[in-house]
Amino acid sequence: MEDYDLVIIGAGPTGLFATFLAGLRDIKSITLEALDYVGGQIPELYPEKPVYDVQGIPKINAIKLRDQMYEQAKTFNNRIELNSKVTDIIKENDIFKIEVNGVYKYNARAVLLCTGIGDFTPRKIGCEGEDRFFNKGLTYTVKDTEKFRDLTVAVVGGGDSALDYATELANTARHVYIIHHSENFKAAEKTIDLARKNEKITFIVNSSVISIDGGSKLESIKIKNELTNDISELGLDALVVAIGHVGRANIYKSLPLQLSPNKRGVLVNSKLETNIPGIYAAGDVASVEGEPANPLIAIGGAQAYQAINYIKKYINPQASFFGGHSSNLKI
């Protein structure tokens, strides 16, 4: 068993920044990632997506942002272990025993959960033909817009991901349709405006996809107007379903964590503490009492900073809460 001050679970954006901050505060940490890559949702869901809401960076490709976060996380040589799924956590006295892939490997004085929305799968439309045409014209993510060059594409959804996909696809596709069951979109105002101004994007609102058709690959979809019940057919080369993901917080059988009402997050107080002393959470997994959910990289980063400072005080009560300015360090 190896001993650490802190085990960080998850190497998405929040976990990577927490790794850097732990090094900044001289906290001996190890970061455990279940997947074989870092970055969490970025490489899996939107590697080609431009990111605009990180302080000081007007625009950056998501995968490039991930790479820069990874480089920053390695600044102090704190360990990051991939293919390391935490399968259980046991608290004995003031020490947490961390089980990885079924084997107890690490002891830690504190744990920081940065697991995002946990194990997740794309939310499906639930219509006829959806499973049949998966990877045969139907996809739930856009990892490479070049694969859609000169194709006629429809994107189903009304959130930021759907409209961002549509705008990016318009750069390579012949034409893009956005299909949404309502007239009201959940995306940011500027995201909606950008899509509406694009001549290669057509909005089909108050409508739902009821079937997906084709031969060896997707060729068309049937759309039902929710107001008139009229059914129409739309010829397509590709369909992107972007209506969210079904997530659930990782559950550790020996750790009675208090979950949020929707079971997708862990309840924390204003100090990012869970109901178990020594266990903290930051990022999408953290459901802060009395606050709305803010699934943003910037919010996760701020929470990581706050959590690491509280963890420093937890493992060393004599330490100052604020560790000073990084600009004062020669790193």
Swiss-Prot record:
Binds 1 FAD per subunit. One of its GO terms (molecular function) is ferredoxin-NADP+ reductase activity. Transmembrane segments: none annotated. Keywords: FAD, Flavoprotein, NADP, Oxidoreductase. It catalyses: 2 reduced [2Fe-2S]-[ferredoxin] + NADP(+) + H(+) = 2 oxidized [2Fe-2S]-[ferredoxin] + NADPH. It holds the Pfam family Pyr_redox_2. SUPFAM superfamilies: FAD/NAD(P)-binding domain. Its cofactor is FAD. Its EC number is 1.18.1.2. It comes from the Archaea. InterPro entries: FAD/NAD-bd_sf, FAD/NAD-binding_dom, Fd--NADP_Rdtase_type_2, Ferredoxin-NADP_redctase_2. FAD binds at T14, E33, Q41, Y46, V86, F120, D284, S327. PANTHER family: THIOREDOXIN REDUCTASE 1-RELATED-RELATED. Homodimer. Belongs to the ferredoxin--NADP reductase type 2 family. This is Ferredoxin--NADP reductase. It comes from Picrophilus torridus (strain ATCC 700027 / DSM 9790 / JCM 10055 / NBRC 100828 / KAW 2/3). The lineage of its organism: Archaea, Methanobacteriati, Thermoplasmatota, Thermoplasmata, Thermoplasmatales.
